[in-house]
């Protein structure tokens, strides 16, 4: 299974020290629908991402959600998250992840954007089929097995959507007001297990707000809990166009801004981030 070693970290630090500001900026925002930029000079390729969690998504155009109709493209359709969790069988969850990881690697993907380990709270949520359970213990157990299966093939799993993203209605702006106890006992255990037991390599920041702060700008969630408390040393990506403030997101450990726009200037982590660094508002 893919793990981040001290040797990996040393190499990453050495490469980072050689990057120009423009190369750093290219890497931290999308350069297409499912990939970020690269640093060709140093041999750093883009991360090629794709949706799970119910099978690798068929190939799409680089700058929109339209399928490539001129390809004979077939993928394996896998059980939904709710079906996987309903087995109460970690071995089957891991097997599902293994199939997904093998197919993703065979198609040249580096990251699978799943599993979805949000807690089901409303029967009206349009993505409940994708989430595993209303039970944080079951979600954690099945999510860990799923992640381990995916990462057997040197493909990074991405635990999403962090955090408290349990409804689709007004998901871009809804403010989820939640007590510390409920946060710790209901909404975060699956993410904690994903990091500490599953070794998940990536986490996706959600659209919604938690107690008045957007998830992709949330110091408590991203820095204090995810990195400092759980020990997460992978990378955090935003949900599509979930970054709304350059400085706020950059300062709390948002690593890659994802979106679909082909316009470089439309990314908060593109020219606005470069200017913020040059002006001294954000540390390079």
What are these regions (language model features)?
Residues 1-284:
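Glycoside hydrolase catalytic-domain context in secreted enzymes
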């Amino acid at each position: 299974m893919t793990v981040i070693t001290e040797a990996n970290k040393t190499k990453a630090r050495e490469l980072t020290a050689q990057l120009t500001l423009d190369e750093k900026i290219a890497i931290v925002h999308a350069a297409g629908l499912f990939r970020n930029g690269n640093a060709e000079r140093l041999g750093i390729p883009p991360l090629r991402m794709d949706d799970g969690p119910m099978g690798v998504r068929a190939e799409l155009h680089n700058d929109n959600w339209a399928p490539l109709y001129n390809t004979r493209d077939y993928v394996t359709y896998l059980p939904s998250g709710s079906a996987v969790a309903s087995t109460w069988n970690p071995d089957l969850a891991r097997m599902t992840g293994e199939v997904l990881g093998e197919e993703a690697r065979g198609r040249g993907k580096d990251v699978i954007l799943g599993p979805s380990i949000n807690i089901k709270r409303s029967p009206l949520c349009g993505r409940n089929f994708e989430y595993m359970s209303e039970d944080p213990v079951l979600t954690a157990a099945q999510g860990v097995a799923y992640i381990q299966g995916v990462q057997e093939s040197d493909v990074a799993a991405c635990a999403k959507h962090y955090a408290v993203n349990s409804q689709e209605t007004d998901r871009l702006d809804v403010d989820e007001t939640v007590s510390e106890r409920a946060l710790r006992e209901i909404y975060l255990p699956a993410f904690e297990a994903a990091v500490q037991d599953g070794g998940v390599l990536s986490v996706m920041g959600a659209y919604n707000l938690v107690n008045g702060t957007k998830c992709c700008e949330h110091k408590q969630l991203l820095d204090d809990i995810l990195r400092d408390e759980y020990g997460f040393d992978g990378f955090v990506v935003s949900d599509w166009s979930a970054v709304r403030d350059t400085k706020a997101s950059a300062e709390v450990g948002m690593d890659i801004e994802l979106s679909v726009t082909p316009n470089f200037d439309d990314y908060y982590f593109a020219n606005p981030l470069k200017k913020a660094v040059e002006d001294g508002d954000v540390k390079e």
